[in-house]
A protein has these predicted regions:
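Hydrolase active-site cap/lid region
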Residues: 67-111, 166
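Active-site loop->helix "elbow" adjoining a glycine-rich segment at hydrolase catalytic centers
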Residues: 30, 59-62
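Catalytic histidine-centered segment of alpha/beta-hydrolase-like enzymes
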Residues: 169-181
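Cap/lid segment of the alpha/beta-hydrolase catalytic domain
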Residues: 1-32
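Alpha/beta-hydrolase fold nucleophile elbow
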Residues: 47-59
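The feature captures the conserved acid-bearing segment of alpha/beta-hydrolase catalytic domains
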Residues: 92-151, 157
Length: 194
């Protein structure tokens, strides 16, 4: 992902900082880059002979996997895990990112309605998924405060109430992770494995 790990900007206070440091237009640009990067990986995998690809991601990776499922028909299944689908609505609860966004908004006199409209460009809620309903599974934690369960529920509603798995836990502590990993395996068994 852009702005994460070795792709973080020098001096970033935390991994992923760059997603928020440049406002929501920067966020949209970073998401477009993430989609481009992943589609390049799909190209490479197909070139090497891979004929089936399922996609999962956690947190912003869940957002990204949901977005990619709306733009690339080569994906056989998608499983967003603790996805955030409206970061503009949840960023107020994300410390320290919320302080950066608050300062940027104050200094630039940013209109909240304009911000909401700007985030629609890269929102998976703005596009119909290309992955069939029976190949979509959303996983979320009941106690998640970084990606509140309401975020996953919004995606679930948008995706025609596809398969959904709740786990006890939060964004960091995935209690019963083996349960949802087994669910993922069962979910993909018929179309991903011979």
């Amino acid at each position: 992902m852009p702005f994460h790990g070795s792709r973080a900007e020098k001096g970033s206070p935390f991994s992923g900082y760059g997603f928020f440091a440049h406002g929501f237009s920067g966020f949209a640009e970073a998401m477009a880059q993430a989609v481009h990067d992943f589609r390049s990986i799909i190209d490479y995998l197909e070139f090497t002979g891979v004929d089936r690809i399922a996609l999962t991601g956690m947190s912003l990776g869940g957002y990204t996997s949901a977005l990619i499922a709306s733009v690339d028909d080569r994906i056989q299944a998608v499983i967003p895990n603790v996805p955030v689908v409206t970061p503009d609505q949840t960023v107020d609860e994300w410390f320290p990112a919320n302080k950066v966004v608050e300062l940027r908004s104050r200094l630039s006199h940013t209109d909240s309605e304009l911000t909401k409209a700007a985030t629609l460009y890269s929102s998976p809620l703005n596009y119909q998924p290309l992955v069939p309903k029976d190949r979509r599974l959303i996983i979320t934690g009941l106690g998640d405060r970084l990606a509140p369960p309401e975020q996953a529920e919004m995606l679930w509603e948008h995706w025609d109430r596809c398969a959904f798995h709740w786990f006890p836990g939060n964004h960091i502590l995935h209690v019963s992770q083996p349960d949802y990993l087994r669910r993922m395996t069962r979910f993909m068994r018929d179309f991903m494995f011979d």
